[in-house]
C-alpha cells in the first residue's frame, strides 16, 4: 500500500487555510445539508460507516468543505495546496440565466489551477449542469476555463450540452452513507465531480508528480465511448485527424478507472514539450489542446436564439453555444467559451461563426504544443 501524507484543514473567519487532500465547494455546506454532505462522502471514498454502503470509492482521503458566498468570493492570496477541488454549484439551471465570470474571481481560480499543489496545479472539477435540452453550459461562465475539468454522468438525460465537457463518469447506481443510513446517490451532474475527484485523488496519491496538464491528457486517453450513449450513431463522431471519438454532451467519453493507471505511467515516461499559447488568428501550434474565445454578441431577437460555432483548420466544427429557448433577453452580452481540440494542428484558418446574432468583438487563443 502506498503511504500518503495526512493533511489537516482549519477554517478561520470563513477562509480556507491549510493543505487537505481535497475540497468540496457548494452553496451551503452547513451540517445537515445533504447536497454538500453527499458530495463530500463521494470524494472521500469508502471509509468508516460509508464502507457499509455499495459505493466503493478509493479511501480514505481528508476532505474539507466550503460554503460559497457571493460570486466575488476569492481564494486566499496564498493558495492552499489542494490536490483536487470538487465544485458542485454553478449557474441556475433554468435555461434563462447567463453567467459570465470576470475580474478577481476568475483570476484567483485560475491561479489556484496553475500554482496549487506546489506549482503542479490543483485539479478544479465542475459539473456540466442539469438544464437538459433547454440549457447549454456555454452560458455558465464557471465552466469556461482551460484549467477546469468539466464532467457529467454518462447518459444523464438532464445533462446540458456543453463543448467544455472533457470526460464523463459511470452512472452512480450505488448507495452512500448519509444521515445515519445508506441512501442512493442522486443522479445529477453534481455527483460527477466528486466521483471523478475520488479517482484522481487515488491517481495523484500513487503518482504525486503529475501536473494538471498531464492529468488532463491522461483523462482524454483513459476515456472511451460507451454503448449506453448509442455511440454507433447517436451524436458520436470520429475525428479523422486525432483518431478520437468525441460527443457534444459527453466529451471524449467515460473514464475507465483501470485505464487511468496505465495512461499515467505512459504520460510519466513521455518527454513532452512545455505548454505554449498563441492568438487564434496566428495559431502556430503543432498540437492544439484547448481553444478559448471571448465574444461580444448582439442578439438578432433573443439571446437564447444565438448559437456559436468554431471550426478548425482541419475542418472540425464544434458548437460552443447552443440555443436556449427560455432565454428571452434582448441585451448585448459578452461570454468566454472553451473547448478541447486534442491533438489537431493549429496552423491555418480558424473561424468563429454566429447565427441568431452579430459578433461585435472577438478575442481568441489556442493552447497546446508548439
Swiss-Prot record:
Enzyme category, top tier: hydrolase
GO biological process terms on file: protein processing
Listed EC numbers: 3.4.21.-
GO cellular component: membrane
PROSITE patterns the UniProt entry points to: P_HOMO_B, SUBTILASE
Domain named P/Homo B: residues: 240-370
List of catalytic residues: 13 (charge relay system), 35 (charge relay system), 190 (charge relay system)
InterPro entries per the UniProt record, alphabetical: Galactose-bd-like_sf, P_dom, Peptidase_S8/S53_dom_sf
Name of the protein in its database record: Subtilisin-like protease
Taxonomic source organism: Ictalurid herpesvirus 1 (strain Auburn)
Record gene name: ORF47
